[in-house]
Amino acid sequence: LNRDRFLNKKQRDAAHAMLEAGADILDIGGESTRPGATTITPEEEIARVIPVVRELAKAAPVSIDTRNAATMRAALEAGAEVINDISALRHDVEALAVVRGSHAPVILMHMPGDDPATMQSLATYDDVAVQVTDFLAERIAACEAAGIPRGRIAVDPGIGFGKTIDHNLALID
């Protein structure tokens, strides 16, 4: 979502078209995570996503795509049911506590570093599949140690996030 802070007709129609096409959940994010993207403050992110989460949560389950604990908390209160964090709960020290204190499932994604602006410069692996697997196993262990049950944890290898085309192909092979 951009800084407009509301769903325009095109976005609303796209969300409903996705649901009609069979989408089970809508993933809403207010901060671009493309390589080299500029970060925004949690306050700006909250202003962008919360009205949209409130609206779309009436029609379908919503996932909040954020690295920020304050946004996670606000989105859950607004009706989001899942937390999707590209930093695997590493970016914000309060994120583990927010997830633990909720009943929401969490998606942990692999990305080298915790900043989309620099992730592509860190795309160096000896064995991408082993290193991504090890990273995700460590993050699962950190979640479990923080009191988040394994049954609430899903993982995402982060295709396209801090990886070359060859890395991406190795992960899906």
Predicted ranges, named:
Residues 9-18, 67-70, 135, 139:
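Short, acidic/polar
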Residues 1-4, 32-36, 59, 72, ...:
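Conserved anion-binding
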Residues 24-51, 159-165:
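Glycine-rich, proline-tolerant flexible connector loops at the mouths of alpha/beta enzymes
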Residues 13-29:
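Catalytic domains of carbohydrate-active enzymes, especially glycoside hydrolases
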